[in-house]
Every structure is written in structure tokens, then in C-alpha cells.
């Protein structure tokens, strides 16, 4: 998931790029950029800034509330609660980088190489960890509902190990960003936070595009489809009081995941094929790809503020947990608390079959 602060592809007018001799004034790793006249994107830039700001605020509020409720619910905290706590942290940390990326959309990258590396690393780590945690949640729901038994992941030390492993793997996958990203300066182009890999940029870019699409989308998607597919089949066969509600939540999980990430990954694949000259690059195609990347990237960013809605606000237990916190601090009357309010807002994964997320 590469959120590039500026587009370098278009500098001069032209249609067929096959015979073009690229300007030597550009950095070596930008020589694969298409010499096209960029379309006016000033309105789009400010529109993106507004979207980033809204997502930042919603994600900050939503994920903070999720973390607050889970941390308060020490008694009866389930495996899924632990995953959701880490997921909320990942989305929250990702959201904290949005103001910097928003500023770079307007002014270019003015924050220097050190912050370029740090912010890019933080963004990538939390992107990978968020997606991998979603897959872990689907596995936990699969084990709890389909097998309806106490799983090995119920052991606290193992759950902590899984979460630490996810963060470690995410850091490992994000290391190329830390190594190769720097502030890029070029004539007539705003400075940007971009990968500098020397003369092998095209080959490295292909590898760095395959990694996030594989580990950040395809593999988690296959895991989610497998787990939720069998979970739905079990719910169809079973006669559970909350079956229909659980089905709506599961459908929402898969649907929102697809809506947010499938368009971006498809466009990213087309962009990779064009940059590596598998598909011939023209100015018209480049402009179409750039616009599509900007639009679908916003969908991916929106996912960070939708997670609290999908995994928490739909469930009654989250609302009960939040009401408990408000009652403890005297903000509401304890009489207004539901009688069946429980500490865990996603359901336990041990001893019984939970049908809510």
C-alpha cells in the first residue's frame, strides 16, 4: 500500500511514449515516468485533504473508544477482543500519519528524509498489521462458531505471541520502505517522499508491489473467505437466536473489506504492469491510472475509520461496555444500564458458540 505524496509521471505533452528519450534532469529512479502534461488536480488535492481530515477525526474517535472499552473490560476479555485491541491500535497509528500526508498533497514533501522514512514505515507497518489482524479475527470466529470448542488460541500467552508475531512480520515487510525511501528533489517538481533504488528501481518496484498485494490483500482475503464461508454454512444449519444478526455482521465484514481494497489493488496491478512496460504507457492511460489510484486510495484509507463501525458499533456489547464506563464516571445513571450488559463486546470464543463480532 504505497501512498505516494506526489505523482511524477507527467511532465510534458505527448501521446506515444515508446520513442521518447527521458530527460536527464530527473532522478534515476524516475526515468520510467511518462512524459505527459498532468491534468489540473488542484480541486482534487484539496478534496483529498478534506477526506483525510475527516477520516483522521473519525478514526481517532472510533478507535480510541474501541480501545477504551476493551481495556476497561478486563474480566471476560475474549481472544477476539485482544485482536480488536491491536486492530484499533493499528488503525489509530495509521490515522495519526494522515495529517502529514494531507499536507504533502498540497505543498509536496517538506518534512525531510528522516520523517519521510519514519512516517512511511509507520504507515506500512500498521497497514500490514491491520490486514493480518482481520484475518486472525476471521480465524478466531471460524474456530469458535464452526468447531464450538475451546481453542488453543484461548491461552493468553499464545494470543500475545500471535499479536507480537503479526507486528514483527509487518515490520519485516515494511523494511524496504525504511531502507529506500527519502525526500526527492527535482527541477519543476515539488519535493516528494519516494523510493530511491538506483538503476534497479523498476525491478524493485515490481517486487515491492507484489509483496503488499500478496500479504496485504490476496492472502488475508482468501483466509477470510474460507473462514467466513464455513462460518456462514454453520450458521445456516444451526438454530441460533442471533443467527441472522451474525450473518449481517459477517457479510458486512467481507463486503466492506472488498469494497475498500479490491479496487485499489486492481488499479495498482495495472499501474505496476504499465511501469514495468508489460502494458504500453501512453499519456491518456497514465492520466486514467493516476485518477483511479487517487480515488481508490481514498477507499482504502476509509477502511481505517470503518473498522470500529463494523467490529464494534454494530454489536450491542460494545454499546453496553461504553455505557458502563459512562456510568462508572457518573456521566449517566446506572439504572439506564442494560441488565444483560457484559464486559466483552465481541463474545467469548471459549466454551460456547458466539455469533457476534
From Swiss-Prot:
Its main location: membrane. Disulfide bonds join 116-193. Signal peptide: none annotated. Residues 1-45, 103-117, 181-205, 271-291 are extracellular. The keyword Zinc does not apply. SUPFAM superfamilies: Family A G protein-coupled receptor-like. Phosphorylated upon ligand binding; which is required for desensitization. The chain crosses the membrane at residues 46-72, 82-102, 118-139, 161-180, 206-228, 249-270, 292-312. Glycans are attached at residue 19. GO terms for molecular function: C-C chemokine binding; C-C chemokine receptor activity; C-X-C chemokine receptor activity; interleukin-8 binding. It is a multi-pass membrane protein. Receptor for interleukin-8 which is a powerful neutrophil chemotactic factor. Binding of IL-8 to the receptor causes activation of neutrophils. This response is mediated via a G-protein that activates a phosphatidylinositol-calcium second messenger system. Binds to IL-8 with high affinity. Also binds with high affinity to CXCL3, GRO/MGSA and NAP-2. Belongs to the G-protein coupled receptor 1 family. This is C-X-C chemokine receptor type 2. The gene is CXCR2.
Amino acid at each position: 500500500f504505497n501512498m505516494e505524496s506526489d505523482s511524477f509521471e507527467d511532465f510534458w505533452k505527448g501521446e506515444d511514449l515508446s520513442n521518447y528519450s527521458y530527460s536527464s534532469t530527473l532522478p534515476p529512479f524516475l526515468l520510467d515516468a511518462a512524459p505527459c502534461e498532468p491534468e489540473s488536480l488542484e480541486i482534487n488535492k484539496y478534496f483529498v485533504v478534506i477526506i483525510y481530515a475527516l477520516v483522521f477525526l473519525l478514526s481517532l474517535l472510533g478507535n480510541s473508544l474501541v480501545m477504551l472499552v476493551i481495556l476497561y473490560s478486563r474480566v471476560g476479555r475474549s481472544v477476539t477482543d485482544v485482536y480488536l485491541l491491536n486492530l484499533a491500535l493499528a488503525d489509530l497509528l495509521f490515522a495519526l500519519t494522515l495529517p502529514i500526508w494531507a499536507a504533502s498533497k498540497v505543498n509536496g514533501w517538506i518534512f525531510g528524509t528522516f520523517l519521510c522514512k519514519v512516517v512511511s514505515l509507520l504507515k506500512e507497518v500498521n497497514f500490514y498489521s491491520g490486514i493480518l489482524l482481520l484475518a486472525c479475527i476471521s480465524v478466531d470466529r471460524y474456530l469458535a462458531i464452526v468447531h464450538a470448542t475451546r481453542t488453543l488460541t484461548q491461552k493468553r500467552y499464545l494470543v500475545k505471541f500471535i499479536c507480537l508475531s503479526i507486528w514483527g512480520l509487518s515490520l519485516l515487510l515494511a523494511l524496504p520502505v525504511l531502507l529506500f525511501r527519502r525526500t526527492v528533489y527535482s527541477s519543476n517538481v515539488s519535493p516528494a517522499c519516494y523510493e530511491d533504488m538506483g538503476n534497479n528501481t523498476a525491478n524493485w518496484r515490481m517486487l515491492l508491489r507484489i509483496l503488499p498485494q500478496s500479504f496485504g490483500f490476496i492472502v488475508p482475503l482468501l483466509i477470510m473467505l474460507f473462514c467466513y464461508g464455513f462460518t456462514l454454512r454453520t450458521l445456516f444449519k444451526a438454530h441460533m437466536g442471533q443467527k441472522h444478526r451474525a450473518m449481517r455482521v459477517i457479510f458486512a465484514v467481507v463486503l466492506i473489506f472488498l469494497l475498500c481494497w479490491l479496487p485499489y489493488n486492481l488499479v495498482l496491478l495495472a499501474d505496476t504492469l504499465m511501469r514495468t512496460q508489460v502494458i504500453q504507457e501512453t499519456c491518456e492511460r497514465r492520466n486514467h491510472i493516476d485518477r483511479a489510484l487517487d480515488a481508490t486510495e481514498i477507499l482504502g484509507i476509509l477502511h481505517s475509520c470503518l473498522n470500529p463501525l463494523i467490529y464494534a458499533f454494530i454489536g450491542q456489547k460494545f454499546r453496553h461496555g461504553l455505557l458502563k464506563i459512562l456510568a462508572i464516571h457518573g456521566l449517566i445513571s446506572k439504572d439506564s444500564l442494560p441488565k444483560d450488559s457484559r464486559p466483552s463486546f465481541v463474545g467469548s470464543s471459549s466454551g460456547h458458540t458466539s455469533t457476534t463480532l
